[in-house]
């Protein structure tokens, strides 16, 4: 009898914890009644928040945030409740706060239903290997990444000087996957088509799984999705295949570590194992690699595509920056170091201005409150609230950036020359440049992203002629979804080898 009662108690407690973590209702408007709400004046539907949230954010910034007042707005995913936009005065309290108070992983779980989809998760180990090992070794990786960009273009394009017409985003995503995979998993897999396909598909699989599960199961019954829904099954299959592809590479890295040959390989897989004394399992390594792919792949390729579009419609900038690249190439004799990359200051400034005008997201520092919190000035947020800061609106504030709607490719070069030579570079973060987040939780891979984009652009612009296909001189229109923006997925480019090369 005692065993039965004990078992029943354990099951009951377990069910309550499951309910608390997965079925607990989202925070209500009533709990946020002290925060003003902003809505669309007409057609205030969830779809409108998916398609037109930028205009509402700008309205909210001018009406509330600029004056230090937070506001709430509808979340396009109704079950998540209202979301809060905070003014910048709260950023310092948030950006250094512990994840036990304000959590991005919890936000990701609630939005993408990671508990049900078998998707790879963020881990401290993965963030550490990028922040420390990868960043520290970028100089050693630079030339290999440059050569990989050359190889990737040679594989994709005809050797003749005929024009190749290609879908810009898909082409650049595949090239980015190959170049970045060299640093993530090493030379054995960076040219493996199946690994590249997994790299490209994982992010979309996560989005699709969340959408499918949310549409098929109410919160109370989502635990069934792991066994019934095809979406988690597809994710499991991708993870299993990733493990199979990584297995021989994993064994090679493990053998090198056991022989104390710590310099044998320069990639994140090796550094992850070395940091744990070779005791990290293959399954866990695969989890880390898939997460790093999700974190870096489409953000890097989207930014690269946006920068290229901005260059191609501004031939005066394109010519000057290509000349700067050629001078750097001559000086380094085709063997890149970080010092030589850093000399391309016009390119760096142009990339940062492109990111300011055409970001991949309108907001930054997305978090969910793990427990109730009262800020220093008395603002209270209950547990379970999604909140964020208005990056895009800050980047278009004329009090911060004069003539913010004008694309000034050398805006940040001028600031480096007149204000501070050590600030305003592409990978830097500040309270007025939020493209990579803020504080201790800023994107740990931003220096890697910067290097990859620059080296790919060097190969594209110095060895090839590139132009937009069917272009009337205007930039291909961006796509919008919720708080996200990205370069056109339909736009095509024309590319051919420069004569004499």
Swiss-Prot record:
Where does the record locate the signal sequence feature?
Answer: 1-28
For this chain, one GO molecular function annotation is: oxidoreductase activity, acting on paired donors, with incorporation or reduction of molecular oxygen
Q: Name one Pfam family in it.
A: p450
User: Is the keyword Signal assigned to this protein?
Assistant: yes
Pathway(s) served: Mycotoxin biosynthesis
Biological process per Gene Ontology, one example term: biosynthetic process
Q: Which InterPro entries match?
A: Cyt_P450, Cyt_P450_CS, Cyt_P450_E_grp-IV, Cyt_P450_sf
Q: Which UniProt keywords apply?
A: Glycoprotein, Heme, Iron, Metal-binding, Monooxygenase, Oxidoreductase, Signal
Query: EC number(s) of the enzyme?
Result: 1.-.-.-
- Per the UniProt entry, the glycosylated residues are 115, 154
Q: Which residues does the annotation say bind heme? A: 443
Cofactor(s) required for function per UniProt: heme
Keyword ATP-binding in annotation = no
Q: Report which superkingdom the organism of origin falls in.
A: Eukaryota
**Free-text function comment from the UniProt entry:** Cytochrome P450 monooxygenase; part of the gene cluster that mediates the biosynthesis of a family of the mycotoxins cytochalasins E and K. The hybrid PKS-NRPS synthetase ccsA and the enoyl reductase ccsC are responsible for fusion of phenylalanine with an octaketide backbone and subsequent release of the stable tetramic acid precursor. The polyketide synthase module (PKS) of the PKS-NRPS ccsA is responsible for the synthesis of the octaketide backbone. The downstream nonribosomal peptide synthetase (NRPS) amidates the carboxyl end of the octaketide with a phenylalanine.
Q: Which family does it belong to?
A: Belongs to the cytochrome P450 family.
Q: What is this protein called?
A: Cytochrome P450 monooxygenase ccsG
Its source organism is Aspergillus clavatus (strain ATCC 1007 / CBS 513.65 / DSM 816 / NCTC 3887 / NRRL 1 / QM 1276 / 107)
**The gene coding this protein:** ccsG
